[in-house]
Amino acid sequence: MRIALGIEYNGTNYFGWQRQREVKSVQEELEKALSVVANHPVEVQCAGRTDAGVHGTGQVVHFDTNVSRKMVAWTMGANANMPSDIAVRWAVEVNDDFHARFSATARRYRYIIFNHALRPGILNSGVSHYHGELDEKKMHEAGQYLLGENDFSSFRAAHCQSLSPCRNMMHLNVTRHGDYIVIDIKANAFVHHMVRNITGSLIKVGRGEEKPEWIKSLLEAKDRKLAGATAKAEGLYLVDVDYPEEFGLPRVPIGPLFLPDNLN
């Protein structure tokens, strides 16, 4: 039997999603909790591995088990055995051909910037703070140069293990909500640090150091050294993963918190 789960987590206290020796990971905590419910060792596969400090509201995983449990046992049981900063949002039985990573058709991230002169006290690890003025309209304009199928070498981490730097960017929207700026990005997949490197470059445009057209020149240059600095992990959320409707996965609000699904 194959089970799919929707996972939400605050990544602040973890060294990323992936299980690692001698450090805390979201995957390890989830697997330990599921193993208690299943009464056998459980290993999960995820839609996307997030880095240290990165959060998730829409992570999807799957695992196989030979025990019969009601779906509420996987949600309530796992949550009862996990730290309070990780939660299972839903559980469904899926066909054996479903794979959390390889069945996914798109991933969506949101990066939240608190744009204010003073740092926040609440949500300080859930947003990235930038004290200077940012022009979100110019940031949005710049982001439109990234749409479509492109080589994202200029926004790819030096140690990225992906075989190809090419990805299909489906949308990139930058909107302001009071003192908060939200960068909403969706693509078929992402190279390592792609969202944070794009964000760092958009910030340079937003503060007037570069014109929106500069983003186009970065794409063409295919040189990471020319782009902006990697933005901090704190403001980044994996909020949604798309799958073919045939798998019947639940649709839930993507957030984080009170943010609506559509910010336009």
Curated annotation (Swiss-Prot):
Show the GO MF annotations. RNA binding; tRNA pseudouridine(38-40) synthase activity
Q: Which family does it belong to?
A: Belongs to the tRNA pseudouridine synthase TruA family.
What residues form the catalytic site here?
A: 51 (nucleophile)
Organism name: Vibrio campbellii (strain ATCC BAA-1116)
Subunit info here reads:
Homodimer.
State the SUPFAM superfamilies in the record: Pseudouridine synthase
Quote the Gene3D superfamilies the UniProt record gives: Pseudouridine synthase I, catalytic domain, C-terminal subdomain, Pseudouridine synthase I, catalytic domain, N-terminal subdomain
A GO biological-process term: tRNA pseudouridine synthesis
- Name of the protein in question: tRNA pseudouridine synthase A
Binding residues for substrate, per the UniProt record? 109
Catalytic function, reaction form: uridine(38/39/40) in tRNA = pseudouridine(38/39/40) in tRNA
Q: Name one Pfam family in it.
A: PseudoU_synth_1
Q: State its Enzyme Commission number(s).
A: 5.4.99.12
Q: Which UniProt keywords apply?
A: Isomerase, tRNA processing
Per its database record, what is this protein's job? Formation of pseudouridine at positions 38, 39 and 40 in the anticodon stem and loop of transfer RNAs.
